[in-house]
Amino acid sequence: MGIKGLLGLLKPMQKSSHVEEFSGKTLGVDGYVWLHKAVFTCAHELAFNKETDKYLKYAIHQALMLQYYGVKPLIVFDGGPLPCKASTEQKRKERRQEAFELGKKLWDEGKKSQAIMQFSRCVDVTPEMAWKLIIALREHGIESIVAPYEADAQLVYLEKENIIDGIITEDSDMLVFGAQTVLFKMDGFGNCITIRRNDIANAQDLNLRLPIEKLRHMAIFSGCDYTDGVAGMGLKTALRYLQKYPEPRAAIRAMRLDKSLKVPVSFEKEFALADLAFRHQRVYCPKDKTLVHLSPPERELSVHEDAFIGSFFDNQLAIDIAEGRSNPITKCAFDIKDSSMQSFTKTTITISKRKGISKTDISNFFMKSIPPSKRPTKSTSLIDVTNVKVQRTHLANDISSEKQSIKSANEKAYVTPKSNSLKPGFGKSLSDISNSATKNENVPFLPPRTGVSKYFKLQKNTEKEIDEQVPSQSNNTTPTSAKSDSASPQNWFSSFSYQTPNSASPPFSSLSHTLPISALAKIGHDALNRKNHASLPSRRIVYKPPSSPSTPISMNPRPKGILSLQQYKFR
């Protein structure tokens, strides 16, 4: 569950990072976090106790992704329940039952998407699911440890013993246990948010420079897995009380005087037990192969306190649980002869190792998890076509064939004509580029050009009509002649030349080039010709007073610098 609002409070210390920054190091992973995310893929099957192993793919994908970036993962799973979390586990069980009933009702009504959401909330990750994942991880050479009780305390202990260099989790109370480097919200590509203990101690905000003791007390006051805390108290309120009363007992006495807070009668005892669970919970030591405390207690604990943080059991059972041979809840060995276990052991190994991974090609690394039918296919592009030469086309000699080719070019895509010089198989290779080349079999042959096409002639006639409608005011401008069907090179050059406009003529009126004039340009020509020697309007607006009304309202002179109502509205 974590501490509600803790990540939001520590947002200034959050840094966006990537797991590749930890290349060459070992990171501990909360395995149950991956399993809880993976149950979304098969929530319906797990809710109705159907055999499935779909949830293994997500966890294995994440572990292989860490290996790809040079990180050595160490997966840690939860063990048996703590007596101090009995009330929390009971509430979670009730919520799961309610979600299952609601999901079953939605499934019967045909609302399958909503039902699957409820089924994913009601699924409880069991030690059998963790055991299957342990076997699958071993096939890929990935190590794992099952904690005697909670994976949070086990991960922090491994970090204190320098067995791991950081922790990947979604549980914010990892910081309350005393973790130094925590990676939150890691996606399937390695992007994550990193919070380091040193950043909290050196925060710019003095109020957030929290030592580990104050951070732990603040979390207990607002509520955690081991106590519900004080009703109506959040993290900021708890921090304010701790800053005013550094001693927890004094802060609790001050809280009782606040009428807006509801402090339980036995909260002092709950606070002490929760503080013990965060500091001295029992964990497994891989070096000594035995159970130890997260941190050695300063005094001898009572029987009730010792049971609250997890009772002690013999070393052989601790080894069997840590290595995944025994169930951490029932303390019994897993029955491999069970039919479900036998079917799993036969099918789990199908998730084969990935070999020959190139670090520069991440797409090949994750491509094996995609079925061949759903893999993207590379489409043929123009670059893929080899030995293709550009075929030069010839202009038509006669006007009739040229008009037909121009008309066909406007109606459909241009088609390369066939020629005897084409290599065999060229049309087949070109079919990937142009579909029209294969559809149109009878393409007319275009002979070499002699003369000018009628298209340019029609264009010149159009320009001539426009020049007649918009006469030029410059005497130096000479219209382009378009009398003959064939234009000489000299006429062709003059038709594309620009005349120097007369300074006395309006703008754009003396240009005699033969480019086609748009409708908007023609409107501009007409407007300038109607007003001789007119210039384009400037941005400066000269105010003209309105005509005086028949009955003036006021004849008082207006002071200099004061705008009239018409001027004000116009501006």
Curated annotation (Swiss-Prot):
Bias type Polar residues, positions: 470-489
InterPro entries: 5-3_exonuclease_C_sf (IPR036279), EXO1_H3TH (IPR037315), HhH2 (IPR008918), PIN-like_dom_sf (IPR029060), PIN-like_EXO1 (IPR044752), XPG-I_dom (IPR006086), XPG/Rad2 (IPR006084), XPG_CS (IPR019974)
Top-level class of the enzyme under EC nomenclature: hydrolase
GO CC terms in record: mitotic spindle; nucleus; site of double-strand break
GO molecular function annotations of the record: 5'-3' DNA exonuclease activity; 5'-flap endonuclease activity; double-stranded DNA 5'-3' DNA exonuclease activity; double-stranded DNA binding; metal ion binding
Record region (I-domain): 114-245
Protein name as it appears in the record: Exodeoxyribonuclease 1
UniProt organism field: Schizosaccharomyces pombe (strain 972 / ATCC 24843) (Fission yeast)
